[in-house]
Amino acid sequence: MIKKEFAKIGKQIIRQLSSTVEKYKDIEDHMDLDAHGNPTIKTVAEHHRLSKSQISQLIFYHFLHVDERGIICDVSEKEIAAALNCTIRTVRNNNVVLAETELISYSRSGKGINICIVPYPQYFEENGFGFMELEYTRFEELILIENVNALRLELRKELVYDNDTIKRQFNPEENTSKISFNDYKIFTPKYTHYKGMMQKIAETQTSAFKTVVQGSTIFFVLKDGAKNGKMSKQEKKEQYNTAIRNAIEETFVKLSGHSTDSTGTLMSSFQNEDITDLVQLSFEYGIERVKSALYSLIEQAFFSHDAQVVENYGGKIRTLIRKELSKNLQDQVPAELTAS
């Protein structure tokens, strides 16, 4: 099971996970009859507050290989349980709840389960709420938070800090974000709606934010050296860009026997758009898989007797990686034999 370094998660989903998930339901109102004496139909909103385990599991799904429709194929329940440090039974029970709240749908497959993150396509709609980037190492820290309300608050801080990005662009000195007591009461359970409890929940510190409660407001700022998902991904983009260009040069040297690609023949075959595509593939499949597939492609395209012109390096690399992953998947033991 491939886990991406960064996940794109809808801001509306983060908002609901840190608060309540709304599910709309049509009911008959027998106290309000129509002209024919029949009960009228009213739409009501049900509010569901997810558990820590359910929140973690839905976020985790975003780190798997999700296509543009929100579909993830052949996921091992055993591997999900291992990643979240829970039982397979918990994974299955969580899926039932997530499906009931219409956040996911799922079905069994020969290699495990197929999952659809229902609202995923809406993250990228022009008039939607947008998405934020979350790094997997940050997610690993979040799921270690024991108190579910502290987890909800930390997710809300991620959301607020990301939303404050535009404000910081105009005034870099304004790097502090805040959550007022009134805002806090909107997304937390009623039994936490007093300042002493808010103070206690906010005391949970992580590597990302330095948090201080002053009066009735939670103030927080990124710790020195810490980066949010958007900043970390930009840094990784630059690293991967350099790594891919170096890999192209090193592959030429190894296959040609020359000390360097002095004429730039090989590098000139790769346009900036090609490098950008390979960087994106590195986020999806990992830089080492991309470099391995790149080596095979360069060998076939430039150093074999039946070499052919490659017009789409990104598409070709993706195909090579998928073939290798498909081969590995075929060798796996069916999930039914390993799950309990």
Regions found by a protein language model. Name each.
Residues M1-E79, C86, A99-T101, G110-I179:
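Short recognition helix of helix-turn-helix/winged-helix DNA-binding domains
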Residues V91-N95, A99, Y106, L144-S340:
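Electrostatic interaction modules used in gene-expression and signaling proteins
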